[in-house]
Amino acid sequence: VLVPRPESELLVELALAALRARSREVPEPRILDVGTGSGALAIVLALEMPAARVSAVDVSSAALEIAARNARAHGVFGRIALLRSDLDAELPPGRRFDAIVANLPYVPRGALAPSPDPTSFEPRLALDGGPDGLAVYRRLLACTPDRLAAGGTLVMEAAPPTAAPLAALARAAFAEAAEVRIVPDLAGLERAIVAQLGGTGTPGANANGP
């Protein structure tokens, strides 16, 4: 799996801020971690928001096994629904979430170091973002508008050079229904893209279960 990096903490902080701002309206939010890998983001979100119903998906069975072990070690295994899925493909139709976090492969294929780089110890699947680093995110944005509940928030991690193009893709995907912004990390580099849907409504509308 991809080794968790400090930059990814920003995704958790942004998701928590958005959810806490709506805590009265949505006291038991549904959260989806797409491409969960080791489960780090889902676990922290579950720990920080005990009332939340957290789902975590990954295309890799091996990654989900690691995520399950980590969730058990942190005492939240029973509160995270782990599912093998290519993005949202295996999620029940109509299930929506109040927050979606995604740290998907975003390294341009040509920039992947063959060796001996630390990335060589991580599966290529967890790094390869296609020719421009945005291939997987394009697929995510094709389905996300149908997965966010009213007022929901999508938080995505990107490489600084692709943050602006990814933000543009998000604006196009939501057809101006969402406020999209780029948030820098502690080093001042453009790192996270946040898409905030307008409107209010039932959390996780038309969804059942965790």
Q: Whereabouts are the PLM-identified features?
A:
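Conserved SAM-binding loop and adjacent beta-strand
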Residues: 1-13, 17, 135
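Short alpha-helical
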Residues: 3, 40, 61-62, 89, ...
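Proline-centered helix-kink/hinge sites
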Residues: 4-6, 104-105, 123, 150
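Conserved SAM/SAH cofactor-binding pocket of Class I
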Residues: 10-116
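Conserved Class I SAM-dependent methyltransferase catalytic core
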Residues: 131-197
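C-terminal lobe and adjacent flexible extensions of AdoMet/dcAdoMet transferase-like proteins
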Residues: 192-210
